[in-house]
Amino acid sequence: MSPRPYQLQQRRVGMDGTRARIVSAARTVLVSGARFSIDAVARHAGVARLTVYDRFGTREGLLEAVFDDLAQSGGLTNLPEAFTQPDPIDGLERFVAIFCGFYSKHRLILRRLNALAVLGRGAAGHGDRNPRRLEGLTVLLARIAASGRAEAGSADVLHAVYALTSFAFFDEFAGAEADPAVVTPRVMALVREIAHLR
């Protein structure tokens, strides 16, 4: 029997390890406040620039991979829980809690990613995530409206709740207090007020 399949598996594991090391290095460079560049990430990961380009294609591809890693480690993969709650208000609360937890866990790096996006040097795909949050809120608020709270379904409510669940709002509102156990109920109280869920 040929050892080739085993060697291919070892190679795949090595490639995954290199990819993870590069993403980790990118996160470290972002948090450090140093200028974010492929060179800086490659140096920190101990690989050649070409290796970074080979794995991610572009700087934007690398930033997108960083955001995917943050989403995974920050709990955004739990978002389906918000849509499976029998009570749509409980679903909205779960949605808010998941985002507040994510923002709290990755606050510093999200500030840097948002700054890069504002400067036009961030991942183009990073901006596509906010419309996904809007879509999720649209579904949840429509469910609440259909359950007899018609005011929750208005466009004004949707846009206000969208603003209240943004990282920019969370970052300002939380101040020095980033504990999601403290911030989440305060954000949810504002969401309840705006959506007429008192």
Pin down the residues of each PLM region.
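Hydrophobic alpha-helical connector segments
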Residues: 65, 78-104
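Short glycine/proline-centered loop/turn elements that form peptide/ligand docking sites
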Residues: 35-37, 59, 147-153
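Alpha-helical DNA-contacting segments of helix-turn-helix folds
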Residues: 29-30, 61-70, 110-113, 129
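Short hydrophobic/aromatic patch on the recognition helix
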Residues: 47-56
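Generic hydrophobic, amphipathic alpha-helix propensity
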Residues: 14-26, 41, 51, 66-70, ...
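Basic, helix-initiating cap at the start of DNA-binding domains
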Residues: 1-44, 60-61
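Amphipathic alpha-helical packing segments from all-alpha helical-bundle domains
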Residues: 97, 101-108, 114, 121-148, ...
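Short helix-capping/turn signature of helix-turn-helix
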Residues: 56, 115-120, 167
